[in-house]
């Protein structure tokens, strides 16, 4: 089934382009049309890729994938209220958490 909305808008815009004499108006209309076409084609391509991926490749179940996905931590989209425990965990794990410059041995003869 063909969507007639883009065809209708193109016909309307072509008639406006023919009837207008100002360059700025025509350039504005042309830029809006090209933006609409680019956004629409990118959206339909993404939808097509998602549909073909979901229908052709079904996830296979095995113990490695399940354990890997269970143990894997997500490092994207961390909410603000969960950021403090992550930093506290990093404080105990890495050198900047337990680094004390006064506890290091002093070299003899160092000025």
From Swiss-Prot:
Q: What induces it?
A: Expressed in the late phase of the viral replicative cycle.
Keyword Signal attached: no
Entry superkingdom? Viruses
Q: How does it sit in the membrane?
A: Single-pass membrane protein
Cell wall biogenesis/degradation is among the record's keywords:
no
Keywords assigned by UniProt, alphabetized: Glycoprotein, Late protein, Membrane, Transmembrane, Transmembrane helix, Virion
Transmembrane stretches, by residue range?
10-32
A GO cellular component term found in this entry reads: virion membrane
At which residues is glycosylation annotated? 65
**Cell compartment(s), UniProt:** Virion membrane
Give the family from UniProt.
Answer: Belongs to the asfivirus H108R family.
**Protein's recorded name:** Inner membrane protein H108R
Give the originating organism. Answer: African swine fever virus (isolate Tick/Malawi/Lil 20-1/1983) (ASFV)
């Amino acid at each position: 089934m063909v969507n007639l909305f883009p065809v209708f808008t193109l016909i309307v815009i072509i008639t406006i382009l023919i009837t207008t004499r100002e360059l700025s108006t025509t350039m504005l209309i042309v830029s809006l049309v090209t933006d609409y076409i680019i956004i629409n084609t990118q959206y339909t391509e993404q939808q097509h890729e998602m549909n073909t991926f979901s229908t052709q490749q079904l996830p296979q179940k095995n113990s490695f994938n399940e354990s890997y996905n269970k143990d894997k931590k997500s490092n994207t989209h961390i909410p603000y209220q969960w950021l403090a425990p992550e930093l506290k965990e990093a404080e105990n794990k890495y050198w900047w958490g337990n680094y004390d410059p006064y506890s290091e041995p002093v070299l003899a003869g160092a000025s």
